[in-house]
Amino acid sequence: MIPVIALVGRPNVGKSTLFNRLTHTRDALVADFPGLTRDRKYGRAEVEGHEFIVVDTGGIDGTEDGVETKMAGQSLLAIEEADIVLFMVDARAGLMPADQGIAQHLRSREKATFLVANKTDGIDPDTATADFYSLGLGEVHAIAASHGRGVTQLIEDVMAPYMDAEEPEVELTDEEENAAYWAEQEAQGEDVPPEDPEDDFDPRTLPIKLAIVGRPNVGKSTLTNRILGEDRVVVYDMPGTTRDSIYIPMTRDDREYILIDTAGVRKRGKITETVEKFSVIKTLQAIEDSNVVLLVIDARDGISDQDLSLLGFILNSGRSLVIAVNKWDGMTEEARAQVKDMLDLRLGFVDFARIHFISALHGSGVGNLFESVQEAYDCSTKRVGTSLLTRIMQMAEEDHQPPLVRGRRVKLKYAHAGGYNPPIVVIHGNQVTDLSDSYKRYLMNYFRRSLKVMGTPIRIQFKEGENPFAGKRNPLTPNQMRKRKRLMSHLKKGK
């Protein structure tokens, strides 16, 4: 399961700056659920291929004596729920009493904790971080979050336990090294699409992990019970009756599924127990662990900012998506028309997802959900050959030529599959990384229509070959050398 990293520390030590650096955002609003918990932000991050969920816990302004009360509630739960804690301190301000109080609490927890000294830019990091070793949390990692210095190395150290062990290097004989060298030279000299590797993976042999997510009391557990045909999940007419994600295996139409019923994302005003306040982490982890996400929306409450924030996290994770508008029964035709107009207005950016209008309580429309779930999963795991992708790319280029970049036409060479769930198309060419966003969207939509992909986002990646002449100066011919010599002589006489 994707690890969770919590950023803790005093106010103004740079937690939000590091959060923005890791999530590649400016305003720290990635997967932010307004009003859920004060000053808490959630984001999905990827650094050097390492994926994780990062949580900004807000400032903890505690003292050595009163840290337990200051860290109660949300901040305390954030530390308990996280897999890794980054305890951030201010290298310029030095060691403060609040830092000592927070460190004392962290030492009492069996949690992987890394001490991070921020704001070390422009100063000697060794001198600035010396006092922090007295906190008893081991090595001090010096970074400058505003400039990104030391951040990549920090994440590599933090994520080391979650990385696959590297395979030991195998020593080659002189004959094997010679053969490998010439094979590499031959491969570099050819500019041809790679052959499609043989893949014995059959996605139909694996159960489909279906995460049922949404705000509290939209009917997620009722829908789960309706699908299973039994009261497997405790249901009450009040938000927050499902506290932890529940994994339930099932079979439908000879197809194996694993249903993931998640704790809902709720507003701060409806929270009555502290244990309910951090269930959003369970939801985000369930999304990452799933193949298809079923987002349940309450037709009578409409689409809230929390729904859109959750939808944004689903899209960022690349998971397949099916939308269920629940509590459709009993609504007038006029009210239904208003809901459909609202869906068209606010969900236009996810036009690839199927939308179903259901009643989990009475079962109407529930049976059709699995057709869309199966379709979305099949589309996200469908294997497509290099020749077909290249042909689609060429047709897109013929219908609408790439724009000029610095006076030269962008050249698209070939395309191949780069991954699945979500489908990734890798396009090779010259200057492809300089393509405008509008043309990239055009290519993405063209591939979606041509491949008839529904229920899953599709991603386009661009790669361009190295220019063998980059950074090299052309040698002058003898004639050019003589002309240069005469010119330099003329310039000297002019002085």
Swiss-Prot record:
Stretches assigned to the EngA-type G domain: 3-166, 208-381
Gene3D superfamilies assigned to the protein according to its UniProt record, in alphabetical order: 3.30.300.20, P-loop containing nucleotide triphosphate hydrolases (3.40.50.300)
HAMAP family in the cross-refs: GTPase_Der
The protein's name in its UniProt record: GTPase Der
Annotated family: Belongs to the TRAFAC class TrmE-Era-EngA-EngB-Septin-like GTPase superfamily. EngA (Der) GTPase family.
Keyword tags: GTP-binding, Nucleotide-binding, Repeat, Ribosome biogenesis
Naturally occurring in which organism (per UniProt): Yersinia pseudotuberculosis serotype IB (strain PB1/+)
Binding residues for GTP 2: 214-221, 261-265, 326-329
GO molecular function annotations of the record: GTP binding; ribosome binding
Biological processes, Gene Ontology terms: ribosome biogenesis
Pfam families: KH_dom-like, MMR_HSR1
Binding site for GTP 1: 9-16, 56-60, 118-121
